[in-house]
Amino acid sequence: MRKRFGEIVAVNGLDLDVPPGVCFGLLGPNGAGKSTTMRMLTAQTLADEGSISVLGYELPRESKQSRLEMGVVPQLDNLDVELTCRQILTVFARLYRVPRAERDAAVTRALEIANLVPRADTIVRELSGGMRRRLLVARGLIHRPRLVLLDEPTVGLDPQIRQELWTLIDGLRADGVTVLMSTHYIEEAERLADTVAVMSAGKIIAQGTPAELVRAHAGEQVLEVYGPAEHLAEVSELAAEHGWASRRSGPAVAIMRAETLDGLAPEGARRPANLEDAFVALTGEEIE
């Protein structure tokens, strides 16, 4: 897929294949093309080049059919603040053609999944940010979709609320729902995704399980060297001379693949490599 906005190439030759029943994470910084990709998968934005098939439906020709089997949780809160949780879910049950006889049960199920039963008759204006986010998820699940698209599902939420959303997403995976999630939170991708595709400048530059990405691009261990700026500059120069992959990590220089270093390695603290190390090694960018 390719998509341009004027001179800006938002998505540049992206190939994506999401198998059923997995949580697939698109990980990248803001501007990597994640949200544009999500909009193309719902036919809100049309690709300039390439073909898109979602759940066996060709887009954009069969986008209406695909949307009936797809749940979408947008990045931005677009809830009607004057309606109650129950009213919003009832409206969307009708829009998604849930049979009349099954609507009440569908609404109750969605409220239960999102842990919003006690707030069923509360208007949206009175809900906390975390509750509103859970309501967005419940709205996307009202019709029992085969595929759920989550665009930055926990952006702007505090850590406790983020954990609650992660538990909800874990429940979707346990139910066999296919989840495609975009995120710029490394911890979120590492925690939730079965497979992670790292995006940069509109392309997928690496793909695999979190553990596979770490092994392939950061190794098993990282050596962190602390000290004054002058010492860190010397360590960076030493790493460059010996071809050791390294990066600045807060007040330290982190050297990848520490398990392979020879006796010339400086003194420092060793730790297991993680997905952040792999991401920075791949892209050269630091993200959350």
What are these regions (language model features)?
Residues 123-130:
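Conserved ABC ATPase signature
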